[in-house]
């Protein structure tokens, strides 16, 4: 077991997946398979692999069947499934992060596909950071059309976000401090990436930990890349 006692998790799975639908997938985005396993299943299994059994998951209102599938598939877990169509990634994040459990929360987007061993290494490293800090998973694998570049100092502390020509970008997995979970953002913020920048500017201690192989699964080519990584020999 990698996680600390009582650590809860959150999964953001409320996006529409429009580009995958245009590419021919007929299932909701969380149910898109990579190497035969739906994204939502592989994400949940990553949380289970680090010892987290209490999860808050948000899906949109067109994904009620997905919510029912998750509850049936993982009946042994303590799941809080929110069925709500949100206006933004930030709203979805706040729905998940607002769960009643105290303390830090490990949050992942459903389309941040990575192998369990890489996920486990990230969580192990992130938990060694100060409890009052938020830790971002960052990756050198830049396949996103609009990546959020991260600049860090030699100790891994994040010094700037949304930097040009980055060597590392956010990977869609976050260990969020209790403070950051409860802070009310300014009303003009609409996207999670903007919220992260605001947290950093507001004095939130923020660190980055590298996940070498993580894919933001938004397009057909992303599915192909994730499947090639799934078939490759796991890193050690």
What does each model-identified segment do?
Residues 1-25, 204:
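N-terminal nucleotide-binding beta1-loop-alpha1 segment
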Residues 7, 53-54, 103, 132:
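Short acidic/polar active-site loop segments enriched in Thr and Asp
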Residues 26-41:
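Short catalytic helix/loop segments, enriched in acidic residues and glycine
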Residues 37-54, 95:
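A short, N-terminal amphipathic alpha-helix
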Residues 54-60, 136-138:
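Short internal beta-strands
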Residues 62-64:
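A conserved acidic beta->alpha catalytic loop
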Residues 66-153:
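Conserved beta-loop-beta/alpha segment of the NTase-like Rossmann-fold superfamily
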Residues 124-127, 142, 157-236:
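Catalytic-core segments of class I nucleotidyltransferases/pyrophosphorylases
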């Amino acid at each position: 077991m990698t996680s600390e006692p009582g650590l809860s998790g959150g999964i953001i799975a409320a996006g529409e997946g429009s580009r995958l639908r245009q590419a021919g997938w007929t299932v909701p985005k969380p149910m898109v398979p990579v190497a035969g396993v739906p994204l939502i299943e592989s994400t949940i299994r990553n949380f289970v692999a680090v010892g987290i059994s209490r999860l808050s998951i948000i899906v949109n209102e067109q994904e009620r069947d997905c919510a029912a599938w998750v509850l049936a598939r993982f009946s042994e877990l303590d799941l809080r499934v929110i069925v709500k169509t949100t206006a933004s990634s930030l709203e979805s994040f706040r729905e998940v992060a607002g769960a009643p459990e105290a303390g830090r929360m490990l949050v992942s987007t459903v389309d941040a596909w990575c192998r369990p061993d890489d996920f486990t290494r990230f969580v192990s490293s992130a938990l060694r950071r100060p409890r009052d800090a938020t830790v971002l998973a960052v990756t050198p694998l830049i396949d996103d059309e609009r990546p959020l570049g991260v600049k860090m100092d030699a100790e891994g502390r994040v010094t700037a976000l949304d930097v040009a020509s980055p060597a590392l970008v956010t990977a869609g997995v976050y260990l969020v401090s209790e403070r950051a979970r409860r802070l009310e953002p300014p009303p003009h913020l609409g996207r999670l990436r903007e919220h992260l920048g605001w947290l950093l500017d507001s004095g939130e201690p923020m660190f980055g930990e590298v996940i070498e192989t993580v894919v933001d699964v938004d397009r057909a080519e992303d599915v192909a890349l994730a499947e090639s990584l799934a078939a490759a020999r796991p890193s050690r």
